[in-house]
């Protein structure tokens, strides 16, 4: 049957041979009667069809209207996001660059962090606001006295401080030696009932541990909670410049133990530098490392694990196969060997601090030829396994072949090709340009230090530029002079399609200025905000552009330290360029830097813990960048920076990354980039950036097309003319005139 009916034809019959009777259910019809019914039935069917078409049209209209309303909601949401972004940046322009966004009313950075995991909100529920970078003042304690001032405390007081530190999710991550020094360097402070210990909005640079008494925490007059003995408060202030986000008042007479930021930084930096230098010194004595570059030895030092063995423990047993190398950090080990024909193992020698054993195991499977036994009370060793060693060094055959050859040339580090020499200096045409020649056309962005304006030179609007104006007084107040000069010097040194060009710098009594290449496609962050997230193809293109820029910087021993979509600009061509080099720094080969700076959601664990960092911090940020492009938000994000740092220290493996947008291959790349140990991150090995390019996520990607700009970009921004700023948010004029600044720090800018 081609249809269905509630009736069916039961039978056909003929009474006289001419008339046919048809029985339908309980009724009988003659054929001609049924024939008369056909037009009526067809008309009824036609009416039903018309009704169905009408209903379908109504439904389609409703669907269309729903779609229109969804579009209006999306448009309104984007406008709200834009307005929120503008308002937040406007607020930041009057605040310290180190001040993070205000936390939610129910949280603060004064107490201990709650146990939590990073939870990704449902689609479309998150509010996208620009992320704010933070920075401590640049520090260098290498030439400062080796001793720190210690303050007397009772045994009970020291234990109370240690217990408070161990309960704090951030501070408990510090090394044992650092915690001991931190406790010794804290000094006593007392406050009477009713006295304010911390006031909201004031700059903060001290951490407190409550020893006795009770305090009340409030924000904007509303009580948030109380703090009692054994509580840590203000830990964000020992990391970088920030303003207090809440007030703390003593309810009773209180006793506090206090640590200044400068002392905390000196403790972490000095001990970290001493440990790193000591390991490098140990490694330089090992014959198979003798001809490695200082940079490569430094990376080996980064990946060495620290282990402790009690006295009497066999670290190695004769006859076992080994794949690890050991350096004695403290204590002693006894070397014994079983000699054929002798019942007892013969003692060969005692090894002390700085001695090493097992180095041949790094070159291949080695049968241990002796026992290594920890001596009482115990021994601390630094360990390097063959897998980590191979990733850093590359071709082991080179080491095997040249082992012990003092004349050997170091060929283990991949030498990138030198950048192509630029024939024409693009800055020459700006040699005679002064501020008087520059005309402002529109505002492209605002921030804590100043504004970025679209400008033209000598009234020629056919060519436009970006003028970055930075308030000198604000720079001095936040002690960022060194960072600003570093930005100028690094950008003057660079010349590549992957980095915005700096043409010239100026200064007057109120500002220092940078005349920059303009990218009228706008910030990648704005495009990401409006689209919600990017697919695999789009994200891969923008990650590849960043990778080209990072490789260029790393070849010059420059660490970028502020990768995020906000600092990626779209050129008219749709290709990406890095901008904002305020945190970039040029490092000596094999050396680290120690200043806490970056964007909270993007900083690596070693920056948070002030262990010293290098270019590997950029590879961590690259992993976070991939996540944000594909998920629409960074993977580590919480209600305040301190909680964000706690999530980061828990590691990428603790993340619950939703796979609805980011596939297994991209997730695998993120986890290889975001390893806790900097030396284990993809890109830090002997293959450098090429190891990242070879990852499966980039399989089939046209790298040559990217470099020659023949690869079609996924998004082509609409730019109508050189003065078109429609791809940027609208900003109100700035009527706030900063005071003059005459200290002279900008001489030669």
Swiss-Prot record:
Q: State whether keyword Coiled coil applies.
A: yes
**Modulation of this protein's activity:** Binding of cGMP results in enzyme activation.
| Enzymatic reactions | L-seryl-[protein] + ATP = O-phospho-L-seryl-[protein] + ADP + H(+); L-threonyl-[protein] + ATP = O-phospho-L-threonyl-[protein] + ADP + H(+)
Q: How is it modified after translation?
A: Autophosphorylated.
| UniProt KW keywords | ATP-binding, cGMP, cGMP-binding, Chemotaxis, Coiled coil, Cytoplasm, Developmental protein, Kinase, Magnesium, Metal-binding, Nucleotide-binding, Nucleus, Repeat, Serine/threonine-protein kinase, Transferase
Motif (Nuclear localization signal) positions are 461-473
Cofactor(s) recorded for this entry are: Mg(2+)
| Superkingdom in the source lineage | Eukaryota
SUPFAM superfamilies (UniProt xref)? cAMP-binding domain-like (SSF51206), Protein kinase-like (PK-like) (SSF56112)
Its annotated function is as follows: Promotes chemoreceptor gene expression in response to increased cGMP levels by antagonizing the gene repression functions of the class II HDAC hda-4 and the mef-2 transcription factor. Regulates gene expression via recruitment of a histone deacetylase complex containing hda-2, saeg-1 and saeg-2. Represses body size and lifespan through the dbl-1 and insulin pathways, respectively. May also signal through daf-3 and/or daf-5. Role in egg-laying, dauer formation and motility. Regulates behavioral responses to various chemosensory stimuli in sensory neurons.
The record's listing under PANTHER family reads:
CYCLIC NUCLEOTIDE-DEPENDENT PROTEIN KINASE, PTHR24353:SF111
Instruction: Specify the protein name.
Output: cGMP-dependent protein kinase egl-4
Origin species, per record, is Caenorhabditis briggsae
The record lists the lineage as: Eukaryota, Metazoa, Ecdysozoa, Nematoda, Chromadorea
